[in-house]
């Protein structure tokens, strides 16, 4: 592979390799097992957020306070994910841009362990993640990571 001509797109499957939580497990844990079956995970998230039965999340007629609490719990659960051999192999690829739907910072942690340091980031967006990225560098090799669904460092960005 030639450097900087390729992009890697990845999601939670990398975390599942090392027995990290998948979305269904995470939502089941957060909702104390009360998720709806046979509906997409996105709707399960909304159901937990809006549920009258999930009293710790539902704080009124709108979802916003409940959703903030839900995002906080998701971020706390995902902050304990550790890297694995797949992340190390991914970080060693001659690729500049990594696009991820993951909220966790596992690739960033892996890069730091490999001697990379953060040289730039843009996380000015408070709600969405269109321009949210971090750049890491080691020996003139740069890696730019885009969290397109938000990240646990900016919990409100989680979508």
Regions found by a protein language model. Give the residues of each.
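Gly/serine-rich nucleotide phosphate-binding loop at the start of the catalytic core
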Residues: 1-91, 96-99, 107, 117
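Nucleotide-state sensing region of NTPase/ATPase domains
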Residues: 102
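Conserved subregion of the PPM/PP2C metallophosphatase catalytic domain
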Residues: 108-112
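Active-site gating loop/helix substructures
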Residues: 117-159
